[in-house]
């Protein structure tokens, strides 16, 4: 286990007698990017809570490197509109952070211009960068990013993915990222894990950045995107339970009614 930052083995979580997670095996190593994908209700948020230590599994184990430093970027930040909170004051909620450190973190993510702005006035894309800067202020060995590109168009996704890759390269941290997109993922992902209560399949993404039409559409950020092809050996019913019996015929092709997207 010495090479891993975090390792989950046979993790299961049950709510109201139903399995939300079942027999989950997952690990993240320094410098490794793992992207977690899956349909709504697949257990992605529950898995992130287990990784962060906010939820204890009903069975299985979650091992963390001793004194592991984790930087967490939530999907959204809900702030009372009447609360007088600037971006600087928000970042200084991290212990030991002063203005120079906050400014340096914002510069690293390209958002230094909002340092004195009220958090309520910052745009969605800028707020994502502020949340990423806050995660970096913890000098993390592991970055946990919960849908960092939610609500961002494909060009914006490519730009953010490129930024995350640069941060990984600069800091050498491991990255566990949750994505709402079941097929388009960050090209530098080392492993894609498809979750639907259990690990349905996993593998490497296929780069599409070499396609001239793709490059023309997304420019310099095209290499940040890749397609992930699912290779499921089973199916799920309408309740998300595994349908017993072997999968026969051609490899699974996703349709509009498919639980996996």
UniProtKB/Swiss-Prot annotation:
Record membrane topology: Peripheral membrane protein
Catalytic activity: Zn(2+)(out) + ATP(in) + H2O(in) = Zn(2+)(in) + ADP(in) + phosphate(in) + H(+)(in)
Location of the ABC transporter domain: 6-221
GO BP: response to zinc ion
One of the record's GO molecular function terms: ATP hydrolysis activity
Family annotation (Pfam families): ABC_tran
Sorted UniProt keywords: ATP-binding, Cell inner membrane, Cell membrane, Ion transport, Membrane, Nucleotide-binding, Translocase, Transport, Zinc, Zinc transport
An annotated GO cellular component: plasma membrane
InterPro entries (alphabetical): AAA+_ATPase, ABC_transporter-like_ATP-bd, ABC_transporter-like_CS, Metal_Ion_Import_ABC, P-loop_NTPase
PANTHER family the UniProt entry points to: METAL TRANSPORT SYSTEM ATP-BINDING PROTEIN TM_0124-RELATED, ZINC IMPORT ATP-BINDING PROTEIN ZNUC
Function (record text): Part of the ABC transporter complex ZnuABC involved in zinc import. Responsible for energy coupling to the transport system.
Similarity remark: Belongs to the ABC transporter superfamily. Zinc importer (TC 3.A.1.15.5) family.
Protein's UniProt name: Zinc import ATP-binding protein ZnuC
Record organism: Pseudomonas fluorescens (strain Pf0-1)
Top-level taxonomy: Bacteria, Pseudomonadati, Pseudomonadota, Gammaproteobacteria, Pseudomonadales
Gene giving rise to this polypeptide: znuC
């Amino acid at each position: 286990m010495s090479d891993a930052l975090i390792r989950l083995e046979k993790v299961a979580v049950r709510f109201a007698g139903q399995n939300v997670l079942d027999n989950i095996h997952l690990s993240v190593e320094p410098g490794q990017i793992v992207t977690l994908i899956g349909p709504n209700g697949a257990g992605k948020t529950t898995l992130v809570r287990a990784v962060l230590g906010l939820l204890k599994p009903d069975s299985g184990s979650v091992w963390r490197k001793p004194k592991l430093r984790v930087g967490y970027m939530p999907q959204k930040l809900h702030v009372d509109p009447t609360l007088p909170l600037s971006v600087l004051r928000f970042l200084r909620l991290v212990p030991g952070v002063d203005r120079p450190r906050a400014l340096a973190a914002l510069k690293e993510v390209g958002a230094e211009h909002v340092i004195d702005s009220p958090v309520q006035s910052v745009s969605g894309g800028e707020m994502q960068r502020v949340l990423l800067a806050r995660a970096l202020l913890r000098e993390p060995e592991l970055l946990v990013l919960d849908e960092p590109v939610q609500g961002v168009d494909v060009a914006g996704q490519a730009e953010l993915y490129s930024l995350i890759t640069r941060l990984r390269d600069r800091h050498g941290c491991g990255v566990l990222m949750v994505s709402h997109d079941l097929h388009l993922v960050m090209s530098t992902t080392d492993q894609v894990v498809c979750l639907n209560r259990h690990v349905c399949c996993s593998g490497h993404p296929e780069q599409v950045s070499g396609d001239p039409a793709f490059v023309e559409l997304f420019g310099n950020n095209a290499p940040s995107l890749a397609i992930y092809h699912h290779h499921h050996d089973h199916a799920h019913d309408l309740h998300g339970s595994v349908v017993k019996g072997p999968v026969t015929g051609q490899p699974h092709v996703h349709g509009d009614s498919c639980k996996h997207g």
